[in-house]
Amino acid sequence: MKSYHKELWLNIEKRMDFINITPEVEQAVIESGIKEGLCLVNAMHITASVFINDDEQGLHRDYKSWLEELAPHEPLSRYDHNLTGEDNGDAHHKRQIMGREVVVAITKGNLHFGTWEQIFYGEFDGMRNKRVLVKIIGF
């Protein structure tokens, strides 16, 4: 069994946004040389997420609206976490809702997706460098 890892660095210019990182993950699979295995894609920050869904802008707008309803950024006083001097209590909740990582099967050297599935990085406290880990294991 082989393993391979790669780190993706992102700096999203908005507080909240979703970026399709499927091409970067596909490139990591090619670089790994692994034909059959698993690919873990993991947000390495507690205010960011990795998830799988359709790359459809209306859906992304719906997610942003829904997340803001569930965990609004303001008022900042809503979150005890913000009493520490932070202003990102909402971002921690949004990450918890959207999840930390995904695992995708690798079959014949390709990510094995269902119809329309793509891998997204979700940012909830942007405007700084953040890291995504891609860890691939297999044969």
Where are the predicted features?
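Active-site histidine-anchored catalytic micro-motif
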Residues: 1-139
